[in-house]
């Protein structure tokens, strides 16, 4: 796929019915691009490249992570999910559900490579791109591609090209803001394109169960149900004073999302000289320290890979968590020397984490390194924490 796939001439020649000399609707359009079961998909791609004859995406399979002799499911295939095997589940429990479970170890170096390949491909066509995590990003379609009438066609062409070129599938959500685009990408999977425009909220989003609203956690669901809030429509039409009494200050955020309101910009984070970071929701509210620090371990490896790629080192480490009431807490520490290896980043991250966390439930954890400088990269125990 060359750049002609995303040019005015290409669409006028091959899709004349979608092009108009009056231009496109000036309503803002955002794409959310999300790799389907990313770690599982990338492990499947890796073993296929190594000669394995079976695509584990089509089998009951998981990628697992070990932390202090506890094994957790890091990612599950679609067939595994249908059997009730979920992210964060104890691996032994997953094996009880399906004794023939195929298990694959994580390879974060390879995952980072796959992520970089995707972002590099997308940047050829979308100058304004915000990488949201290792496996998802937002692009500002309206600003960057002003001559196209039908974003669905563009998204479908892009989705198919990613599958052909990179050997893994993505969902692409299209909406009038980042929130709607992200909600759309979570509709039916895998390898799909979905829209959720403002005029489609009533039909596509409001009938959904309240826990399917991005930003609304299952922990909230029982209390909301007691108040008669079972669907997103119920939340969108509740009295604001009533919501404040139930949700506190977070009511405004959820109410705005339930009504499809989101004014946040797609912020290009291409310039990594200022700092690099990684964060992830834990999928569940948890106070399991071993499970939480397994994320920090993974992030340390991701950061080493990014630093190595850019030949950078840094001396400020930052760790942050999000509590179940959606308040954030962070700690950072400035070192007297530069570091760039996973083992050192992880070492300081653990110290910071234990300072800021006191056993309470959290649902997001993040790790960053900043004050970066160009330096010779020293490889000490690269990936040894995870892969050996």
Model-derived segments and spans:
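Gly/Gly-Pro- and Ser/Thr-rich, intrinsically disordered tail segments characteristic of DNA damage-repair
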Residues: 9-246, 250-253, 375-388
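Structured loops at beta-to-helix junctions and adjacent beta-edge loops in soluble globular domains
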Residues: 64-66, 142, 279, 322, ...
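DNA-contacting surface of Y-family translesion DNA polymerases
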Residues: 24-25, 212, 220-364, 372-387
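Polybasic, lysine-rich low-complexity intrinsically disordered segments
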Residues: 4-5
């Amino acid at each position: 796929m060359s750049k002609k796939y995303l040019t005015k001439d290409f669409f006028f020649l091959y899709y004349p019915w979608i092009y108009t000399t009056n231009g496109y609707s000036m309503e803002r359009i955002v794409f959310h691009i999300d790799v389907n079961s990313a770690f599982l998909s990338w492990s499947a791609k890796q073993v296929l490249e190594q000669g394995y004859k079976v695509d584990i995406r089509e089998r009951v399979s998981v990628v697992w992570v070990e932390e202090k002799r506890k094994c957790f499911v890091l990612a599950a295939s679609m067939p595994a999910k249908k059997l009730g095997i979920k992210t964060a589940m104890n691996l032994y429990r997953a094996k009880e559900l399906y004794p023939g479970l195929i298990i694959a170890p994580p390879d974060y170096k390879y995952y980072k490579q796959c992520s970089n390949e995707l972002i590099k491909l997308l940047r050829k066509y979308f100058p304004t791109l915000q990488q949201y995590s290792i496996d998802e990003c937002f692009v500002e379609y309206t600003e960057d591609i002003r001559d196209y009438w039908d974003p669905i066609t563009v998204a479908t062409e892009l989705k198919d090209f990613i599958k052909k070129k990179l050997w893994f599938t993505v969902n692409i959500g299209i909406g009038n803001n980042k929130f709607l685009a992200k909600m759309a990408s979570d509709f039916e999977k895998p390898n799909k394109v979905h829209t959720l425009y403002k005029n489609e909220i009533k039909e596509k989003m409001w009938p959904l169960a309240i826990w399917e609203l991005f930003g609304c956690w299952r922990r909230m669901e029982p209390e909301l149900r007691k108040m008669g809030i079972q669907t997103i429509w119920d939340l969108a039409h509740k009295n604001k004073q009533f919501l404040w009494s139930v949700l506190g200050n977070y009511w405004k955020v959820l109410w705005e999302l339930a009504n499809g309101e989101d004014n946040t910009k797609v912020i290009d984070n291409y310039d990594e000289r200022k700092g690099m970071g990684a964060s992830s929701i834990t999928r569940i509210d948890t106070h399991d320290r071993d499970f939480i620090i397994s994320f920090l371990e993974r992030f340390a490896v991701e950061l080493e890979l990014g630093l190595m790629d850019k030949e950078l080192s840094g001396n400020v480490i930052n760790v942050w968590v999000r509590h179940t009431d959606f308040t954030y807490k962070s700690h950072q520490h400035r070192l007297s020397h530069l570091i760039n290896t996973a083992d050192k980043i992880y070492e300081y991250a653990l110290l910071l984490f234990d300072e800021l966390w006191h056993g309470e439930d959290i649902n997001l954890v993040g790790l960053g390194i900043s004050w970066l400088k160009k330096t010779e990269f020293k490889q000490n125990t690269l990936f040894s924490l995870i892969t050996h």
